[in-house]
């Protein structure tokens, strides 16, 4: 029975990784094609649906960690996925005013290259039991450039959205109401920005540690 469940797990994770890989490959292709043909102002319109699908599919990774399908700690996975979902739905989907900014293009390209490398790496690992050495190096080295460009784009887009969040009062809840509860999305977004200050360096150091362990292990093998 344990052997059968192991096979089911590997088949499921193989399919999951390659399906999401295909989604991010589509995002990258559409972003680059649109950038070349009509400019960065139109990139979001071209990639909106594929981006939403590919990024929202990452929610399953939290469940994978919770039920033990993968060894990735939820404490590391949750903030990464949470911040991306916040950008995808809370900023880009909700505030069209920022969609034509060039930071959308740098964000999407940084995210998609990162995820194409990551999902194909784990796709090979689950399907074949290993990944090529060059793929391992890419998996644990590409973040050195792509994480800073991605984070810079995220912070920039959140900052650009702040005036529109404040004037629209979208997602804010004012008193009085039946629940006797108030919520200000503008100040919540400022709090999210503040979390980036300690959170980004911490995550970068975490990934540097991952890189050191993974590459050291590959040299020993």
Curated annotation (Swiss-Prot):
Residues on Lumenal side: 33-51, 96-100, 166-184
Expression by tissue, per the entry, reads: High expression in young seedlings, roots, root tips, flowers and young siliques. Lower levels in leaves and stems.
**What does the record list as GO biological process?**
fatty acid biosynthetic process
What residues sit in the active site?
147, 154
Cellular component, GO, one term: nucleus
Per UniProt, subcellular location reads as: Endoplasmic reticulum membrane; Cytoplasm; Nucleus
EC main group? lyase
Q: Which UniProt keywords apply?
A: Cytoplasm, Developmental protein, Endoplasmic reticulum, Fatty acid biosynthesis, Fatty acid metabolism, Lipid biosynthesis, Lipid metabolism, Lyase, Membrane, Nucleus, Transmembrane, Transmembrane helix
Quaternary form?
Interacts with CDKA-1; but only with the 'Tyr-15' phosphorylated protein. Interacts with PAS1. Part of the fatty acid elongase complex which contains a beta-ketoacyl-CoA synthase (KCS), a beta-ketoacyl-CoA reductase (KCR), a beta-hydroxyacyl-CoA dehydratase (HCD) and an enoyl-CoA reductase (ECR).
Give additional notes from the record: Plants with reduced expression of PAS2 show impaired embryo and seedling development associated with cell de-differentiation and proliferation. Root growth is reduced, due to a delay in cell plate establishment during cytokinesis.
For this entry, the protein name equals Very-long-chain (3R)-3-hydroxyacyl-CoA dehydratase PASTICCINO 2
Species source reads: Arabidopsis thaliana
Gene (name only): PAS2
């Amino acid at each position: 029975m344990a052997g059968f469940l192991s096979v089911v797990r590997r088949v499921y994770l193989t399919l999951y990784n390659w399906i999401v890989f295909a989604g991010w490959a589509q995002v990258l292709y559409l972003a680059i094609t649109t950038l070349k043909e009509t400019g960065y102002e139109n990139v979001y319109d071209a990639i909106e649906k594929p981006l939403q699908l590919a990024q929202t599919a990452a929610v399953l990774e939290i469940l994978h960690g919770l039920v033990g399908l993968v060894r990735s700690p939820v404490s590391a996975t949750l903030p990464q996925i949470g911040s991306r979902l916040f950008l995808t739905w809370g900023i880009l989907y909700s505030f069209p005013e920022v969609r034509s900014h060039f930071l959308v293009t740098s964000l999407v390209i940084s995210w998609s290259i990162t995820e194409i490398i990551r999902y194909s790496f784990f796709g090979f690992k689950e399907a074949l039991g290993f990944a090529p050495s060059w793929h391992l190096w890419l998996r644990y080295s590409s973040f050195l450039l792509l994480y800073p460009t991605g984070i810079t784009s995220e912070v920039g887009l959140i900052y650009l959205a702040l005036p529109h969040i404040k004037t629209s009062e979208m997602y804010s809840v004012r008193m009085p109401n039946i629940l006797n509860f108030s919520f200000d999305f503008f100040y919540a977004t400022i709090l999210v920005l503040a979390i980036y200050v300690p959170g980004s360096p911490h995550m970068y150091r975490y990934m540097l540690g991952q890189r050191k362990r993974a590459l050291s292990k590959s040299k020993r093998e």
